[in-house]
Regions:
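Glycine-rich Rossmann-fold phosphate-binding loop(s) that bind the pyrophosphate
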Residues: 7-10, 133-134, 157-159
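Short, glycine/charged-enriched secondary-structure capping and boundary segments
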Residues: 18-21, 43-46, 89-90, 122-126, ...
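Beta1-alpha1 glycine-rich phosphate/pyrophosphate-binding loop at the start
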Residues: 1-77, 166-189
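A Rossmann-like FAD-binding core segment of flavoenzymes
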Residues: 25-27, 69, 75-96, 103, ...
Length: 241
C-alpha cells in the first residue's frame, strides 16, 4: 500500500508514524511545504526571547531522523498543488527548483495545517507587521529584533501564543501592549480565571487594551500606528498578529 500525506507538522507526522505501526510494509511519503516537520508552536516565542538558544531544539524530528526511525519519506519544501482522485495522483511542486511532478497513491491523507489569518485591513503587509505560527515566522521576527532593536511591540490577540510572546518580548526589555476585541484574555477561560491572568500580565508591565477593534495600520517613520475603533490609536516599533 502506498500512502501520501499532505502536511508534515503535528497531525501529518503523527498520522505517518501511526500508519507505520499498523503496517510495516506500507510505502509512506509526506509532503511538507515548509522546511520543518514535527515542531511545537508553543516553543516558538521562547526562541525569540532567547530562552531557547539552539534553533534545532524547536523541532522534535528532522526528515533524516524520521526516516531512520520509521522508514517514512519526509519531503520538505514540497507543496501539493492539486489532487486528481480519478487517477489517484497528486501534483507536487518542488519549491526549491520549481519542478512539478505527479505522484500516485493508494490512500491519501490531508493534514495541511492552517495559516495565520491576516485581516483585510488597511496597512496589512507593511514590513514591521508579523505573524507567528511557523518556524520560519519565528526566524523572521528574531532577525528583525536583532537587526532593528525595537523598544516596543503591539500584539493583536491574547491567546496562548500571544501571551507567551508577550512574556518573552517583555523579558527582552520591550514595552509590550496586547490589544484585542474580546474583553478578556484567553477567551475559553472563565472570567475569574482570566482576571488572574490580567493581574499577572499587568504586574509584569504588560499593557492590556481589551474590548477594542483594530481597524488598520499605518507605517510611520518611527514604527507602526495601530488604528482602533472608538479609541485613540496606539503606536509601537513592531506589531505581531
Amino acid at each position: 500500500m502506498k500512502v501520501i500525506i499532505v502536511g508534515g507538522v503535528a497531525g501529518g507526522a503523527t498520522a505517518a508514524a501511526r500508519i507505520r505501526r499498523l503496517d510495516e510494509h506500507a510505502e509512506i511519503t509526506v509532503f511538507e511545504r515548509s522546511g520543518y516537520i514535527s515542531y511545537a508552536n508553543c516553543g516558538l516565542p521562547y526562541y525569540i526571547g532567547d530562552v531557547i538558544t539552539d534553533p534545532e531544539e524547536l523541532t522534535l524530528q528532522t526528515p533524516e531522523s524520521f526516516f531512520k526511525r520509521f522508514r517514512i519519506n519526509m519531503k520538505i519544501h514540497h507543496e501539493v498543488i492539486s489532487i486528481h482522485p480519478d487517477r489517484k495522483t497528486v501534483s507536487v511542486k518542488n519549491l526549491e527548483n520549481g519542478e512539478i511532478f505527479e505522484e500516485n497513491y493508494d490512500k491519501l491523507i490531508l493534514s495541511p495545517g492552517a495559516k495565520p489569518t491576516q485581516p483585510r485591513l488597511p496597512g496589512v503587509g507593511i514590513d514591521e507587521l508579523f505573524t507567528l505560527r511557523t518556524v520560519e515566522d519565528t526566524f523572521r521576527i528574531k532577525e528583525y529584533i536583532n537587526k532593528n532593536h525595537p523598544k516596543s511591540a503591539i500584539l493583536a490577540g491574547g491567546g496562548f501564543i500571544g501571551l507567551e510572546l508577550a512574556e518573552n518580548l517583555r523579558e527582552l526589555g520591550m514595552d509590550v501592549t496586547i490589544v484585542q476585541r474580546p474583553k478578556q484574555l484567553m477567551n475559553p477561560f472563565d472570567p475569574d480565571m482570566a482576571s488572574m491572568i490580567h493581574n499577572e500580565m499587568r504586574k509584569h508591565g504588560i499593557k492590556l487594551v481589551l474590548g477594542y477593534t483594530v481597524e488598520g495600520f499605518k507605517e510611520k517613520d518611527n514604527g507602526v500606528e495601530v488604528l482602533l475603533k472608538d479609541n485613540p490609536s496606539l503606536q509601537a516599533d513592531m506589531v505581531v498578529l
